[in-house]
Amino acid sequence: MAVAYADKPNHFINFPLTQFQGFVLNYKGLQFQLLDEGVDCKIQTAPHISLAMLDIQPEDYRSVDVAIQEVIDDMHWGEGFQIKFENPHILGRCIVLDVKGVEELHDDLVNYIRDKGCVADQSRKWIGHCTIAQLTDAALSIKENVDFINSMQFNYKITINPSSPARLEIVKLGAEKKDGFYETIASHWMGIRFEYNPPTDKLAMIMGYCCSEVVRKELEEGDLPENDDDAWFKLSYHYENNSWFFRHVYRKSSYFRKSCQNLDCNCLGFYESSVEED
C-alpha cells in the first residue's frame, strides 16, 4: 500500500522551547548577534522544533490528539533523554540550529499518527532543526552575511524527563504567536501519565458496574459505550494499562477521581456534593 505524504502540509506537531529559560537566554543571544551585525532578517519569536508535518482536516484532530497521547504513554523514560542544539547555519532562507536527540520521538509520532489513518511526514528526509531567523533575499545574497552566520557558535543541551516542562502540540500552519508560543489545537505535557498512578492492579477492586453510568454522565458523549459490559471493559482495560483513556477519564470525571483516591466507590449513595474537589 502506497504511503501518503504531507508534502503540502497544513499542520505540524510542535515541541515548544520557550519554557526552557536557559535555552531561550542563549537562543536570544544568537538573535542579538545577528541584529548587532546588521543582518536583515525576521527573528523567530516562538522557538520550537517541528517534529512532524501533517496534512489533516478538523475531523482528524481527535485521532491525532489520541495518537500523541499514546506516544506519551508508551515512552520508556529511564533517566530521560537529551536534546542537543548546535551548528548555526543556513537552511533554505532560514538560519537554523541542528537538533539531535528527538529522532526516535519523530518516528514514533509519524507511525502512531499514520496508524490512525492520518497523513504525516514528508517524502523528503526529516531534518531536526530549530529556526533562529528568516533571511531576506537581499541578505542571503551578501557574502559577508553568509560568512558571519557560518562563523557563529552554539552548543546547548536540554535534559527531558517526566518532570520537565516538555509538551507536544498540534499547531496549524500560520497560527498566531503570543508570548513565545503558538496558538494550539491541542497541547499535552509529556510527563502527564506520571501524575495518575493506578491505586490498585484491578479497577474491579474499587469500583462496581453501577459506577459506569455515573462516570458516563461526566464524560463527553460517546466516550463510553452504552452497553454497561462494554463500558466496564473499556474502563478496566485502559485503566490497567494506564494509557490515554485512563487519564482522560481521570481528568473529566470527578467521581472517578474520588473513587480512585479513596479506593472505594459510593455509586449507590451518589450525590453531587460527595465528589466536590478538596
From Swiss-Prot:
Gene3D superfamilies in UniProt: Cyclic phosphodiesterase (3.90.1140.10)
InterPro entries attached to this UniProt entry: Coronavirus_NS2A (IPR007878), NS2A-like (IPR039573)
Signal peptide residues on this chain, from the entry's feature table: none
Coiled-coil spans in chain: none
Pfam families for this protein: Corona_NS2A
Similarity comment: family membership: Belongs to the coronaviruses ns2a protein family.
Protein name: Non-structural protein 2a
Organism of origin: Bovine coronavirus (strain LSU-94LSS-051)
Higher taxonomy: Viruses, Riboviria, Orthornavirae, Pisuviricota, Pisoniviricetes
